[in-house]
Amino acid sequence: MNLRTFSTPALFLDCVGPTLLAREGESSLLLGIALRLVDGHSYGDEAPFLACVEDEGRCPVVALRTPPFNLTLCGDAGRLDALSLVADHLAHAGCSLPGVHGRIDLTDSFGSLWQALTGAVPRICQGQRLYQLTEVATSASAVGRPRWAESRDAALLA
């Protein structure tokens, strides 16, 4: 298992794109930022941190940060070994993280590792929810026919 960093957003997406798309519901923020970076958008003066942990052909953790903004994580919260590689790399690089985005179990696990490395005490600043469509229900067609609006419909239109 190793931490792999990327010099360009295109190389990053080539490697982690399939992983992110497979978990699109939870990785939409990370994926959106990466796609904007590929298109040439800049979020600050510093180069972005683009990384994944590789383990036997899989990416259990994907990380992205556009300084000075928060770290964004996607992956398996149970893989403390993989999260530890990300935390160790950032701590040894002297990074000061203002925050971490991701699923609560993932950010909690990372926060504990980060606290052990840096002494920074993590806290939840803003809880958010993400909804994912898992099933589409079809509905019956509406009965009726189209018609032009008339003056008697004014209250419905205005």
Please give the residue ranges for each predicted region.
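A short, aromatic/hydrophobic, helix- or strand-capping loop or linear motif
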Residues: 26-36, 101
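A general structural signal for well-ordered secondary-structure junctions
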Residues: 25-26, 43, 96, 120
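A short helix-loop-beta-strand connector motif used in the catalytic cores of GNAT acetyltransferases and
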Residues: 37-58
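A generic alpha-helix structural signal
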Residues: 17-20, 34, 86-87, 111, ...
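Acyl-donor-binding surface of acyltransferase catalytic domains
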Residues: 55-60, 65-143
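Exposed alpha-helical structural elements
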Residues: 11, 15, 29-33, 81-85, ...
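Short amphipathic alpha-helix that is part of the acyltransferase structural core
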Residues: 1-30, 136-158
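Short, solvent-exposed polar/charged micro-motifs at secondary-structure junctions
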Residues: 13-17, 38-42, 109-113
